[in-house]
């Protein structure tokens, strides 16, 4: 089955609070996944089709990359593309960021986290489904070392503002900027980012650093 066929059948939004996304998941043997498991890890939460990480992994072989995605067919297709490019510093994993992160990342040298264009869940009653929660921020504070960074991006101002406020509210993070970043810190754009910029629309970006303990 082609990547295109798989994407067509994937729902754009899934409810992360659904019971099936609360169940335990197996954790890979990272020594079999990554050629150099001790390399700094860049985690992309909600990686979708994974094209951002595919390009980043090729550009930065000295880092490892992990894409976490809740829509399983996208994970399968992304790993197939990775295999075709024979990248041993990249993996995609099915999971729920608000449930599985601590178990997944135990022992991995996490250094960078990106949360880019997450599902906005516009209706107020659905805000609890948004990926950035106080609990997620607290988990990332536990997993990131001092100097580790978090980069947030969204084309929805209210969503971007909410994400920034939640990281600001946690004492373990400090902003490394005083206003929205005009440019991405990465040489690679996500598919959504390209689409938004091609339409001449705004992207709201912010960066945080994990404070010293």
From Swiss-Prot:
S-adenosyl-L-methionine binds at residues 44, 69, 96, 119. This is tRNA (guanine-N(7)-)-methyltransferase. Keywords: Methyltransferase, S-adenosyl-L-methionine, Transferase, tRNA processing. Pathway: tRNA modification; N(7)-methylguanine-tRNA biosynthesis. It is an enzyme of class 2 (transferase). It catalyses: guanosine(46) in tRNA + S-adenosyl-L-methionine = N(7)-methylguanosine(46) in tRNA + S-adenosyl-L-homocysteine. Belongs to the class I-like SAM-binding methyltransferase superfamily. TrmB family. Catalyzes the formation of N(7)-methylguanine at position 46 (m7G46) in tRNA. It comes from the Bacteria. PANTHER family: 3-DEOXY-D-MANNO-OCTULOSONIC-ACID TRANSFERASE/TRNA GUANINE-N 7 - -METHYLTRANSFERASE, TRNA (GUANINE-N(7)-)-METHYLTRANSFERASE. Its EC number is 2.1.1.33. GO terms for molecular function: tRNA (guanine(46)-N7)-methyltransferase activity. The gene is trmB. The active site is at residue 119. GO terms for cellular component: tRNA methyltransferase complex. Substrate binds at residues 123, 155.
């Amino acid at each position: 089955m082609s990547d295109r066929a798989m994407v067509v059948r994937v729902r754009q939004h899934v409810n992360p609070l659904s019971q099936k996304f609360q169940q335990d998941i197996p954790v890979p043997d990272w020594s079999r996944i990554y050629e150099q498991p001790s390399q700094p890890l860049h985690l992309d939460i909600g990686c979708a089709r994974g094209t951002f990480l595919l390009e980043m992994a090729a550009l930065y072989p000295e880092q490892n990359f992990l894409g976490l995605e809740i829509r399983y067919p996208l994970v399968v297709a992304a790993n197939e593309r990775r295999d075709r490019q024979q990248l041993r510093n990249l993996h995609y994993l099915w999971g729920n960021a608000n449930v599985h992160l601590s178990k997944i990342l135990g022992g991995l040298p996490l250094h960078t986290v990106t949360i880019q264009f997450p599902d906005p869940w516009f209706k107020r009653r659905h805000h609890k489904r948004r990926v950035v929660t106080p609990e997620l921020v607290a988990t990332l504070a536990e997993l990131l070392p001092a100097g580790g960074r978090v980069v947030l991006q969204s084309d929805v101002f209210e969503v971007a503002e909410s994400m920034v406020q939640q990281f600001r509210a946690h004492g373990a993070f400090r902003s490394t900027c005083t206003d929205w970043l005009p440019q991405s810190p990465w040489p690679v754009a996500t598919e959504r980012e390209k689409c938004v910029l091609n339409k001449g629309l705004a992207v709201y970006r912010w960066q945080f650093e994990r404070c010293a303990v």
